[in-house]
């Protein structure tokens, strides 16, 4: 609809009115209390046409929430929402050879950074099948997401597998995806958030517009309690023994002999990283941004694990692989 850009400006924390056609943007939604509700990448397909992605399994809830606002709060806006979740199948080509594989599949598509930069999309034909390709990444690697009509999903998948054989292509699952995104410090809403986290708590204040007049949850971000310096904040954790993988949900303490023991936070995501050859974890810790380098403890079933508070980005901090 003609007010689609204005609608996105109101539901996301960042700005959308100047997003160019053919470009993608990561967006963060808040509840009215200022806490993170959902995130995803939205692409501008045309002047008045966008396609929005949400967290895994969150599409129906987000659609319901947006419809509620559209019908009860902003009925004057010329906007129409349609669920296309079941209409498309998506194959994600991910890794340093993904550009070479895509070039084999669509040899006449210019994949140069000038023509097809990160966070942009193209409409193409693959074996006469109309597809959308987004150059976006949740793994931190060079990635292309191919969206095809659902009935052609398997055909596109097989096309990717066949084209990638010479590069030793292999399917990867959600566990691998979760590990790779954790190495980059990318959050999963509902895992690294719990309904009490603001963008600032997640070290994502960069995504909150300072210029927009309003958006859902903006006023609540400036409440005294929400602006406290010692709120629980997202941090990285590194174990003293790099082979120990922390339990997700485990509590974090500063003193082992304190009675009663004060719980500073908990582990939200934890994995062993083959890329780094050590365990990594994300956690929310009270006053976390001022705890960098501090030694803390994570009590587990058989022993107390010593950890050090670290940056949330463990790998490729300069995004060299993402922009390869």
Region spans (language model):
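Well-ordered mid-protein domain cores that form the structural environment of catalytic cofactors
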Residues: 10, 14-69
